[in-house]
Each structure stands twice: as C-alpha cells, then as structure tokens.
Design a protein with these regions (language model features):
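Canonical positions in the second alpha-helix
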Residues: 11, 44-45, 105-106, 140
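Short coil/linker segments at helix-helix boundaries
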Residues: 65-102
Length: 151
C-alpha cells in the first residue's frame, strides 16, 4: 500500500481536482491505519464535492475510528490521577465530536441511511453530557427507530 500512496500522490500532483484519486488515497491510508492522513484526504474529497454522501460519511467514519483507537489506548492505561484521566477523555471525546458534523451532512444528503443514523445516535449518546448533545441523541434515536421500523 505504501507504493500505492506514491503512485496516487504523483497522479494527484498532475490532477489535483480528481475526487476519485483523493478518495482512493484516503482509503489506502485507512488500510494503513493512518487516520489523520485518511481524514485529510477525505476533507479534500468533500472540498471538491461537498454534496457527495460518501465523502461526508467516510469523514465521520474515520473520525469515529480514530476516536475508537484513542479510546482503546486510554482503556489500556493505568491512571493514578483523575486530572490526567479527564484530560485524556476530553481528547477522545473531542475526536468523536469531530465526526458529528460530517455524519449530519451525510444524513442531510441521504436522510434514510440507517448506518449514518446509527453512528449519529451512538456518538451523541456517548457525548450526551455535552451541551445540546442529548437533544441530538433523542432526535437521531427517534429517526433511527423510525427508519428501522422499531416501535
């Protein structure tokens, strides 16, 4: 995959407006578990095509995966200080928060996409103690149930 990055970067250099190249670059970095580069590539996808569902959706997914990876690291640590734990938790939650607007844009583009609603519902539940997020959770949970035909 690292060889592919060099090839795609060379192709992007001569064709920087090609959404498919940026999309492919983002997927390769995802496979390499380089979430920051993946996110940067997909930000370019969305810059070039703001209403592309997949671009917005995958940005949300990559922020969520990055948050999951940081959360896993955090869970493996031994904490002797509540302040250090709280600081690490804030970093993790801030990454999850970054996912929300991308999923919201994806939801706006494709309102009946169950996966998008499930991500929004789950992330908003996790962040429910943040200002205004519990209301979002209630909204997305209701929409999710409606789309899934639950209740």
């Amino acid at each position: 995959p690292a060889d592919l990055v060099a090839l795609i970067d060379a192709a992007i250099e001569s064709n920087p407006e090609n959404v498919d190249l940026w999309f492919g670059r983002g997927r390769i970095f995802y496979a390499l578990k380089d979430y920051d580069q993946s996110i940067e590539s997909f930000k370019k996808v969305v810059e070039l095509k703001p209403d592309l569902f997949e671009g917005n959706y995958y940005l949300g997914v990559f922020y969520t995966i990055k948050g999951d990876a940081l959360n896993k690291e955090m869970n493996e640590k031994q904490y002797s200080s509540q302040a250090v734990y709280d600081a690490d938790l804030k970093v993790v939650n801030d990454v999850y928060k970054e996912a929300v607007p991308w999923f919201e844009k994806a939801h706006q583009i494709k309102p009946d996409d169950v996966d998008t609603l499930e991500f929004l519902k789950s992330i908003c539940f996790r962040l429910r103690d943040e200002a205004g997020i519990m209301e979002k959770y209630n909204t997305y949970n209701a929409l999710y149930k409606q789309v899934k035909g639950i209740e």
